[in-house]
């Protein structure tokens, strides 16, 4: 029994998610459908890639991943099936596929052959038929035509100054807690740092310490009754994906706020690290 995942920008209010699931169950009654996210910002393939890339690896090989973001077919945007690390991905040729793969990671792409006319809702009217073919064991070559031509979206890669005194990055994701994740990886940070001191700068805010985990901000040497509460304090750490992350300890976007709101951070805002 293969697992089928859904990643879309449909939200949870409308009929769309339920309709897609119904169409898939009609064709694959014993399937297991897993929702990865339906709250992707509309048409944002970079946000889609961050979520799906870091989720799919935890599913068993052979899983089928449906990408319902910016999926409408047109003369310049085909529907593709990708085979990557034993996983199948179905979506539109909008730049998403190379974002899902690591640098220089081999991928196989197939243009999906379909006699279904252009539709406003391909995730419902086209993709379930492709899912069915993969689910029932057809090879990618039986489903589509191999192609090496596809749209390559530009990665938001951090930049290092020529004297290696600075790393310049951007915010690539804001999560449910308001944590703002940059594209600066731990490996890049440590390679450039070389045991030097550092200052992480965003607008008027600066940080000179990176914590290993959230609770490290608590002074456990101080008795609880006389200990200052760190709730709502800003902090830096490398998240579980090893990207530099701006956080608020025990953030609640409804009360104390998250890093994105309190620091005024938004997608693709610039951050820098100064080594000295």
Describe the role of every protein-language-model region.
Residues 3, 263-276:
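Short, basic/aromatic-enriched C-terminal tail that caps enzymatic domains
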Residues 10-14, 72-75, 177-179:
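Short acidic, Gly/Ser-rich segments with clustered Asp/Glu that frequently serve as metal-coordination loops
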Residues 1-8, 15-68, 274:
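Alpha/propeptide regions of enzymes that mature by internal proteolysis
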């Amino acid at each position: 029994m293969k697992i089928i995942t859904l990643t879309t920008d449909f939200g949870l209010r409308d009929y769309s998610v339920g309709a897609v699931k119904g169409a898939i169950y009609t064709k694959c009654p014993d399937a297991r459908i897993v929702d990865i996210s339906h709250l992707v910002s509309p048409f944002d393939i970079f946000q889609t890639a961050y979520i799906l890339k870091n989720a799919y690896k935890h599913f068993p090989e052979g899983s089928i991943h449906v990408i319902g973001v910016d999926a409408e077919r047109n003369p310049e945007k085909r529907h593709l099936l990708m085979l990557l690390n034993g996983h199948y991905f179905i979506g539109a040729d909008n730049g998403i596929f190379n974002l899902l793969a690591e640098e220089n990671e081999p991928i196989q792409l197939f243009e999906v052959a379909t006699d279904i006319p252009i539709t406003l809702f391909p995730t419902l009217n086209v993709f379930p038929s492709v899912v069915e073919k993969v689910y029932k064991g057809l090879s990618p070559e039986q489903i589509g035509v191999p192609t090496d031509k596809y749209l390559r979206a530009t990665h938001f890669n951090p930049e290092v100054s020529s004297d290696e005194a600075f790393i310049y990055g951007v915010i690539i994701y804001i999560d449910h807690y308001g944590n703002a994740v940059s594209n600066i990886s731990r490996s890049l940070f440590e390679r450039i740092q070389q045991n030097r001191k550092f200052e992480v700068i965003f607008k008027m805010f600066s940080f000179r310490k990176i914590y290993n985990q959230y609770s490290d901000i608590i002074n456990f040497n101080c008795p609880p009754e006389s200990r200052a509460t760190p709730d709502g304090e800003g902090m830096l750490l490398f998240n579980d994906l090893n990207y530099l992350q701006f956080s608020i300890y025990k953030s609640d976007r409804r009360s104390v706020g998250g890093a994105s709101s309190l620091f005024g951070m938004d997608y693709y805002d610039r951050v820098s690290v100064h080594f000295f």
